A protein has these predicted regions:
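Membrane-proximal, glycine/serine-rich, low-complexity loop/turn segments characteristic
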Residues: 25-305, 315-328, 490, 494-495, ...
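Short hydrophobic transmembrane-like helices used for membrane targeting/insertion
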Residues: 7-9, 61
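N-terminal signal peptide c-region/cleavage motif recognized by signal peptidases
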Residues: 19-21
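Exposed, low-structure sequence patches enriched in small/polar residues
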Residues: 5, 12, 183-185, 294-357, ...
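Positively charged n-region of N-terminal signal peptides that target proteins for export
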Residues: 1-6, 25
């Protein structure tokens, strides 16, 4: 039998030397079958399609045009080209490896990744604002690149880190969202959109370049520049984001590393002096609308530099043989480490100035009475100008272990555990700095431990749980407990999934909620922990465009920013409920997509939410030329009921609760034509189509911050694979 095996392998190698150039995608299962057949002596002269000869990275050429030359004598001096080693990482399943290109993001705590498709379709192309991509998207203070907050309360970030930069997280790169790529060929993707006249123009430019050095090693560069000169006074913004990353996903060892840089330069308008300036259309040009900080020359400059390296190595608990393509199906232990450096800074400047509201109130004769005021009521450090700077830095080290008892997709797939140490540094002006001549730096150390377990029962059940605890020291007593499960049934080959999640947490106030000193605000607080219990249930049928969701939360001792823009803690419990429904109809190319969210808060003075929010998209999609040019023509509309929406404070960079003006009952409609011509996407869009046509004219999502008026947009996106 051994002799027969060696003869079979020898014949296999001879056939490889004369094989034609391989072009099929790598199928790990087929490769393993080929190895087993070879080991059993089962390969025949004509059966090499299951062996290494189908390696898609073997690009050797034997003939003049790449064809094999059967019957011709081979050059005995020609050096044999060694087949390139295929992608063997346990992170990727056979179906993922078979993709031409794919991307993923890494998990901060565990040895896991999240696969995501590369978006080159028309699905979200017409939504040119990144903060609009998820379900109903975010409420924004204006247009492209500006501060925003999620419509759905349950989708908002609850982290206490870098809270002053949170309004821009839909645009900024971070460890959680930086993409890593695996490409069969070098990949370049460029996007450019612009709108409006030159003096008011919005511009959106992106470029991504990625290349695999070998099947397991990739390098990529991402650069995004989103900004606007602004339709309204003092609304110019530059939002630039850069990510340079490297990934090696080998059979046992993996490393992910990235350098990230975010720069945001935002002029601050402070919002309109009164809603009448937008609703009554008394100004011919948006640039003439009076803003509360127009004369104050207010400005925010944010800078972020981040760098991380995440590594892990696998130790198989079973002997690996030539039949084992990856470690995913073996008992194994993985040991890993994460190092992260993350630093954000903010500089806010302004000067003393007043604004005048010409329609502040009516007198006894019914005529309008004007009122002159200042945006900020306090000038604590300098009565004429402001330059408030602050910075926050975190250096993180995490050591984690992952056990794989049987296989990665087993009933008990992975058991995770880890410990971490966060070194926090905060700096802001303090009164003692008058004596030292430099900003004081406050350093705090937080350490924590965490654990988790995940498993699957084939493709029908997915479950897991996790727990994180800060035992003592800074943030001592904080914890986060989570559990989830999903059940999938297949009817006519289509998945129907019911899923649920439960979480309970106790969270300390962020540093900036307890400590603040600037020209306009000062506080020293000692808040207690915020406690929250959540659960949600969802039912999805992707093939029929159906998603139903239900969220419930009870929050006690909620910490929020009140009407005076200062932090406050509610002494009781607040109950929040959200119900989400999505149904996409497709009638012979006519798409009628509906997303509706109902939210209820037991105390809208603590957690204000609109009762109903909706996003409707109606368009017709068709082929102009089959497999060459596909086109969408339609309308997008957004709406929410009236409520006391949050305001936005530029000096603090936070959203705060207010009870002065209501926002809502205004539809915001866009008309678009989008197309995909081979690898190119094209967009023609008129934003805010209904401006001045219908609606109450109050085009606001955040109190006193008007949305952009009507403007025409044109854009192009092109992918290159070579």
């Amino acid at each position: 039998m051994q002799l027969k095996r060696y003869i079979s392998i020898f014949l296999t190698l001879l056939l490889l030397l004369g094989a034609s150039r391989a072009s099929a995608q790598l199928d790990a299962s087929a490769l393993m079958r080929g190895q087993r057949n070879s080991a059993r002596g089962g390969n025949t002269l004509g059966g090499m399609q299951n062996g290494y000869g189908s390696n898609p990275y073997d690009t050797g050429v034997e003939g003049e045009n790449g064809e094999g030359q059967p019957g011709e004598q081979q050059d005995s001096t020609k050096k044999e080209k060694k087949p390139r080693k295929p992608l063997e990482s346990y992170f990727f399943s056979d179906s993922i490896r078979a993709l031409r290109n794919f991307q993923w993001t890494v998990d901060r705590n565990t040895n896991k990744i999240k696969i995501a498709p590369i978006d080159t379709t028309l699905a979200l192309w017409r939504l040119d604002y990144p903060h609009q991509h998820k379900r109903l998207g975010n409420n924004s203070v204006g247009g492209l690149g500006q501060a925003s907050q999620e419509v759905n309360y349950f989708e908002r970030n609850t982290s206490r880190e870098f809270t002053f930069a949170r309004p821009y997280e839909a645009y900024a790169y971070s460890l959680e969202n930086v993409p890593f790529y695996n490409m069969k060929h070098p990949y370049i993707w460029m996007t450019y959109l612009e709108s409006g006249q030159k003096r008011y123009r919005e511009e959106h430019f992106e470029i991504t370049a990625s290349q695999n050095i070998n099947p397991s090693t990739s390098f990529s560069v991402n650069y995004k520049a989103r900004g606007a000169k602004g339709k309204y006074d003092r609304s110019r913004i530059k939002n630039q984001n850069t990510a340079v990353n490297f990934a090696q996903t080998g059979k046992r060892y993996s490393i992910h590393a990235a350098f990230l840089h975010n720069l945001i330069d935002q002029q601050e308008s402070g919002g309109v002096v009164g809603e009448w300036a937008i609703a009554d259309t008394v100004f011919e040009m948006p640039s003439g609308v009076p803003m509360r900080l127009a004369s104050a020359e207010a400005n925010n400059l944010y800078r972020n530099t981040s760098f991380f390296v995440k590594q892990s190595i696998g130790i198989p608990l079973q002997r690996m043989t030539e039949h084992d393509f990856s470690m995913a199906d073996l008992s194994a232990v993985y040991i890993g480490h994460l190092f992260e450096y993350n630093s954000w800074s903010k500089v806010y400047t302004d000067k003393y100035a007043t604004y005048t509201d010409e329609r502040y109130e009516r007198n006894e004769n019914g005529t309008f009475k004007s009122h002159t005021d200042t945006y900020y009521k306090e000038w604590l450090l300098n009565p004429e100008t402001t330059r408030d700077s602050l910075a926050e830095r975190i250096i993180t080290n995490r050591l984690f272990v992952q056990a794989q008892p049987w296989d990665r997709n087993g009933v008990v797939g992975t058991i995770d555990g880890g410990i971490g140490l966060d070194l926090h540094t905060y700096s802001q002006f303090a009164l003692t700095d008058y004596l030292t001549g430099k900003y004081e730096r406050v350093k705090k150390t937080a350490w924590f431990a965490y654990a988790g377990i995940d498993g699957k029962i084939r493709k029908y059940v997915d479950w897991g749980a996790s727990f994180k605890l800060y035992p003592s020291g800074y943030r001592g007593g904080d914890f986060d407990l989570r559990a989830h499960a999903s059940f999938t049934a297949f009817i006519s080959g289509k998945p129907f999934t019911l899923s649920g999640e439960f979480s309970q947490s106790a969270t300390s106030a962020g540093y900036w909620m307890d400590n603040w000193l600037s020209n306009h605000y000062m506080w020293q607080n000692n808040f207690g922990k915020e406690n929250e219990t959540r659960f949600n249930v969802a039912f999805t049928v992707p093939d029929h465009g159906i998603e139903l969701g239900f969220w419930q939360s009870v929050v006690t001792d909620k910490i929020y920013y009140g009407a005076d823009c200062k932090p406050a803690q509610h002494g009781g419990a607040v109950s929040l409920t959200s119900i989400y429904a999505q149904k996409d109809f497709n009638i012979k190319g006519l798409h009628l997509n509906h997303r509706v969210l109902v939210q209820m808060s037991s105390n809208n003075e603590v957690v204000p939410v609109p009762l109903v929010s909706a996003f409707l998209s109606y368009y017709y999609e068709f082929w102009v030329k089959r497999d060459v040019l596909r086109v969408q023509i339609g309308l997008d509309g957004r709406y929410n009921t009236s409520y006391y929406a949050q305001g936005y404070n530029p000096a603090l960079s936070v959203f705060y609760n207010q009870r002065e003006v209501q926002v809502g009952n205004y539809p915001y409609v866009d008309a678009f034509v989008s197309a995909k011509w081979k690898r190119m996407r094209i967009l023609l869009k008129y934003q805010h189509l209904n401006k001045g046509l219908f609606g109450n004219g109050e085009a606001f999502q955040i109190a006193r911050y008007p949305l952009n008026p009507g403007m025409f947009k044109i854009g192009i996106s092109w992918a290159f694979y070579d």
